[in-house]
Amino acid sequence: MNRIEKIRTILEQSFRPHQLEIIDESHLHVGHQGAKSGKGHFRVLISSELFRDTPQVKRHKMVFKALGELLNTDIHAISLDTKIPD
């Protein structure tokens, strides 16, 4: 299972998202200090009812908690766009 599949599986199980997009932007960071570790840079757009009435900072903490160990082993940087469904 590649990194995007790992992230997708965790986020789908944790948040039952209405929308989920995961973009690997690692190629944009080749040569940067953080890229030397081999970990990835990702952009995630996720929309879930579980975010309703939850401040943005708490939504991000929820995602970080769900991703858990992947933040140490596979993810160097992650940009989050957390929304509630329309």
Regions found by a protein language model. Name each.
Residues 2-57, 69-86:
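Contiguous, often N-terminal, cationic amphipathic patches that form binding interfaces
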